[in-house]
């Protein structure tokens, strides 16, 4: 399992979801992606993106000034 960090701090909707989608295309099923974002909409958008596209949301954490999401690429 590969673990990748994607720092999207400072980007606004819809860029965090678009860049997350692009990063996941380069990973294999089961690989993990950690996404850091400061966009308040990501709290809704990233979990919804995972649910709609078959990826697993392993963790969602509210940080000071943003969020950290840990995803596993679905098959």
Where are these regions (language model features)?
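Right-handed parallel beta-helix/beta-solenoid
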Residues: 1-7
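Amphipathic, hydrophobic secondary-structure cores in small proteins
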Residues: 8, 15-56
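C-terminal structural segments of small proteins and small subunits
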Residues: 47-75
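A generic structural signal for beta-strand entry/edge sites
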Residues: 3, 32, 66-68
């Amino acid at each position: 399992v590969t673990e990748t960090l994607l720092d999207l701090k400072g980007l606004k909707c819809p860029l965090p979801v678009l860049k997350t989608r692009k990063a996941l295309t380069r990973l294999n099923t089961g690989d993990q992606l950690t996404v850091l974002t400061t966009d308040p909409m990501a709290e809704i958008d990233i979990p919804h993106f995972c649910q709609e596209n078959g990826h697993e949301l392993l963790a969602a954490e509210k940080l000071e000034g943003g969020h950290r999401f840990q995803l596993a690429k679905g098959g």
